[in-house]
Amino acid sequence: MPKKLVPKDYEYIHLDLTTGEINFTSFNSLEELQASLKEGQIFFHKSVIFEEKPESGEIYSPKLISQIYRKEQELFEIREKSKGHPLPVTKKLLKRGQGTIVCCGIYTKELLKNVAEKGQYDTQCDDLNLGIFHVRAHKPLGIAQRLVHLPLPEDASSAAVATENLFGLIRFILVNDPAKKKIYLPISCFAIEKRIEQEHIIGYSQKDSLALSQRAYYEYKKDGTLIGLVALIGVDVKIDGKLGFLYHPVWREKQWALKFNEKMFYCAVSRAEKEKVFKPPYYLEPTAIIVDVTETPVKRLKNTSEDYLWLEVSQISAKFSLFCAQNNLKLEKADSKNKSPFVALSMESISELTGEQKRAFVKILNIPGIIFSSSTLAKARLESKLQYIGPALIEAAADGNFTDVVDIINRIEPLYDYKEILKEALKTQRLGTGNTPLQEAIKGQHTSLVKYFSSLSASLKVINHKNHQGLTALNFATAIGSSPAIVQELEWCSQ
């Protein structure tokens, strides 16, 4: 039997750049680690959980680790000069439409380069063929955030997600092997101070598109039992009486952390702290994470097949309560003993609403804390004449990544019937008239939309938008990848 390797606190991988030798070493504290650093040496945190020690040391490639280290050093220096301000870093490292994403490389054979420019990149993992990395850029209030989605095989029960931090370095690659033989939790340098207990994993349900927009993941036991939610920026983890803390390098203080165990999860942020931490330009949309969640009965979490929308009582108007009553939406109050300021609304019941009802739902509940919408849509909901899909489409078009059209539709599907929206757009001649391929695409799957746009000839020129001829100038601008023309046509469509 292979020897089971369990990581210890402050156990690091030591890389000697001169010899290329890789060893494991432990320190009693970060201060001891820093004091021992010498030129030409790298220590990076061995925050990886696996059941068998790999036979080959290739996953700890010296070249790969050194590249990660240099990127970490660059980010650290910029961060120190900017005194923790994230914007100078994003401007330097994540220019619109281009950039380099560096993967931590554990169980991944190669770096991901120029992913944002190409839009997709093929890679291969040791044990699971994870397919194509789909890269999407989000820029809520000027802060760049990229998500890389790794779809598992069709028979997999969950998907793996790699998430870059705000500085463009992938911090997490979370893989849940459906066979439950191995669990990989590779994380790059200094991402975790304390380990997570081996019997727990962080998983992302493929049916749950919320995890992407929230930048949070449901936390499961290996047997599939739901424990709670895990935030990416800061998390206090308490398991079997042991407390650990996962943190984002920007927010080193424990001012914002979701705490959870098998009975409850809650946010440790007071309103005063939230206003201090999230004030502009540091502000991250409340949609990016669940905030101000107080103690919640475990019975709300046991049914893993159904998700709940949590709403603060103070945000619920009489008009919204009436809407829920008229449309059989049951607002479930938390245990009165806990005096929770939240109520729960079943996501399944929301999904059963018609397109018209969903739009009315969002219009009535016009609050920034609605957790299942993207930050872009939450920020610009109903403010654009394009309505609903317009703001996100403009953002996607500006980045020149047109697979985002499908991604956007997937993300807002819990709110809006995309077929109904596009049919309405066709009626108003915004996305084409007549029996166009787009109409045929509407009848098919989401991917048909991308096939439709990509099928247009790249040699076609942008025509006058008043002369549609069955296709709008937006379609042509999309086909030739002209971002300025796309934005111009989207703005025209909104008039």
Curated annotation (Swiss-Prot):
An annotated GO cellular component of this protein is: plasma membrane
Keywords per UniProt: Cell membrane, Membrane, Plasmid, Transmembrane, Transmembrane helix
Task: Give the way it sits in the membrane.
Answer: Single-pass membrane protein
Question: What broad class describes the main subcellular location of this protein?
Answer: membrane
- Superkingdom as given in the UniProt entry: Bacteria
Kindly indicate whether the keyword Electron transport belongs to this entry: no
**Where is this chain's protein located in or outside the cell?**
Cell membrane
Gene3D superfamilies from the entry? Ankyrin repeat-containing domain
* Ranges annotated as spanning the membrane: 224-235
Quote the protein name from its UniProt record. Surface E' protein
Record the organism: Coxiella burnetii
